[in-house]
Amino acid sequence: MDWPEGLDTQSFSGIGRLATASPQGAQAADILDRFQILECLVDYGPEVIGTLPLGIDIATSDIDILCNVSGLDAFGLFADQAFGDFAGYTRHRRDATDHVGAAVVVRFECEGLPIEIFATDRPAREQYGFVHMLVEARILHVMGDGFARKIQDLKQTG
């Protein structure tokens, strides 16, 4: 099926969509740009996903980044070097499940905005998080802005 412009996988690459999705998305794009977070991760094919690029974020939303790594241990050491000095830095290894391979999960804050990096041996655009975001984007497109606001309201109330 052909999707309207803006709903294809290419439309979600980089920070362009993030910068225009919402005020918090613009803040997130600015932080990613100023601190060169995606440039630092360029060898791992980073993709920003989640509620921020969709414009359905709430105050507690974080920046979610998917990465593709061939060696989890090496990526963990890289992350320690690259992000270890950021506030709240943590890193853990997540065991494989029936649906997702083993992963390294990195969390830290940058200017008060939480960032989570999920790195596994699968290309970012093939990971469930990216596919899930595309499905959400298409549902939001079909259902319209009113539906998106209802989703945000539900997220606010837990």
Describe each model-derived feature in a short phrase.
Residues M1-I49:
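Helical scaffold of the NTase/Pol beta-like nucleotidyltransferase catalytic core
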Residues G16, T20-R34, V69-E111:
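Metal-dependent nucleotidyltransferase catalytic core
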Residues F35-A74:
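Active-site nucleotide-donor binding segment shared across nucleotidyl transfer reactions
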Residues V42, T97, Q127-F130:
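Hydrophobic N-terminal alpha-helices or hydrophobic patches in metabolic proteins across all domains
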Residues P46, F86, I115:
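Hydrophobic anchor at the start of a short beta-strand
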Residues F78-A82, D121, V131-M133:
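"Short basic amphipathic alpha-helical interaction patches in structured regions
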Residues V105, E109, L113-F118, R125-E126:
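A eukaryotic "domain-to-IDR transition" signal
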Residues P123-G158:
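Catalytic cores of NTP-dependent nucleotidyl/adenyl transfer enzymes across multiple folds
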